[in-house]
Amino acid sequence: MKAAIIGAMEEEVAILRSRMEGCEETVIAGCEFSKGRLDGVEAVLLKSGIGKVNAAMGTTLLLDHFRPDFVINTGSAGGFLPSLRVGDLVISEEVVHHDVDVTAFGYAYGQVPGLPARYRADEALVEAAKQAAARLDGLQAVTGLIATGDSFMNDPKRVEFVRGQFPELCAVEMEAAAIAQVCVQFGTPFVIIRALSDIAGEESGVSFEQFLETAAKHSAELVLSMLSVMKQKRY
């Protein structure tokens, strides 16, 4: 079993890198890869950089150079469900772009022509993430839709527009759909697991800066718990 784990920022990968044994680091086109063993599991950790282009480029390099069995995207997100609070965990069932609009030609909002309207996460990975979350005391986890766009969601009008397009939306962030799109095209199983650093809206920028470290810690804890579950289940 070879795991690939992607985070956009240093804060989102630092804890996992510090836990890696036999870590070998490589930089390709600005993407930082760390290869080793994470709690006994062969793993490659990628710090991709922020945004969809960086995420897509990094994921492509990751899959082409390292050939992992599956991809986990970890990090922070902004919450959309009223029941969610900062620090809560969101596990993807589906992922969608919230800033793609080709509806003039009959496509669903968020759909890239020639590709699915939404990208479904691997069911076995989702189940492993849910079991892993249940082992973490004091953390709420939900499973559902995550949406991606190249903008930070602190504009209330934009928040309401996106909520109108995707009423069931759990969280928003800036890389997941790009990672999912590349994984789908490569035929590589994926799941997105994010911890909330903010609740999308006017004060989200302040909250993000204040709680990024907490969100990164919770998300990393879920990744490690998930790898433990998968090792036991012989994924």
From Swiss-Prot:
Pfam families linked: PNP_UDP_1
Which reaction(s) does its UniProt entry say it catalyses? S-adenosyl-L-homocysteine + H2O = S-(5-deoxy-D-ribos-5-yl)-L-homocysteine + adenine; S-methyl-5'-thioadenosine + H2O = 5-(methylsulfanyl)-D-ribose + adenine; 5'-deoxyadenosine + H2O = 5-deoxy-D-ribose + adenine
Which SUPFAM superfamilies does this entry report, sorted A to Z?
A: Purine and uridine phosphorylases (SSF53167)
Keywords attached to this Swiss-Prot or TrEMBL record, sorted alphabetically, are:
Amino-acid biosynthesis, Hydrolase, Methionine biosynthesis
- One GO CC term, this protein: cytosol
Signal peptide (UniProt feature, chain positions): none
Supply the InterPro entries for this chain. MTA_SAH_Nsdase (IPR010049), Nucleoside_phosphorylase_d (IPR000845), Nucleoside_phosphorylase_sf (IPR035994)
Q: What does this protein do?
A: Catalyzes the irreversible cleavage of the glycosidic bond in both 5'-methylthioadenosine (MTA) and S-adenosylhomocysteine (SAH/AdoHcy) to adenine and the corresponding thioribose, 5'-methylthioribose and S-ribosylhomocysteine, respectively. Also cleaves 5'-deoxyadenosine, a toxic by-product of radical S-adenosylmethionine (SAM) enzymes, into 5-deoxyribose and adenine.
Q: Which GO terms describe its biological process?
A: L-methionine salvage from methylthioadenosine; L-methionine salvage from S-adenosylmethionine; nucleoside catabolic process
Q: Please name the taxonomic classification of the source.
A: Bacteria, Bacillati, Bacillota, Bacilli, Bacillales
**Where are the active-site residues found?**
12, 198
Q: Does the keyword rRNA processing apply?
A: no
Q: Which NCBIfam families match?
A: MTA_SAH-Nsdase (TIGR01704), PRK05584.1 (NF004079)
Q: Write down the EC number.
A: 3.2.2.9
Biological or metabolic pathway of the protein: Amino-acid biosynthesis; L-methionine biosynthesis via salvage pathway; S-methyl-5-thio-alpha-D-ribose 1-phosphate from S-methyl-5'-thioadenosine (hydrolase route): step 1/2
Q: Which major enzyme category is it?
A: hydrolase
Which PANTHER family does this chain map to? 5'-METHYLTHIOADENOSINE/S-ADENOSYLHOMOCYSTEINE NUCLEOSIDASE (PTHR46832), 5'-METHYLTHIOADENOSINE_S-ADENOSYLHOMOCYSTEINE NUCLEOSIDASE (PTHR46832:SF1)
Question: What is the protein name given in its UniProt record?
Answer: 5'-methylthioadenosine/S-adenosylhomocysteine nucleosidase
GO molecular-function annotation terms? adenosylhomocysteine nucleosidase activity; methylthioadenosine nucleosidase activity
Record's keyword annotation contains Amino-acid biosynthesis: yes
Q: Which domain of life is it from?
A: Bacteria
Sequence positions that bind substrate: 78, 153, 174-175
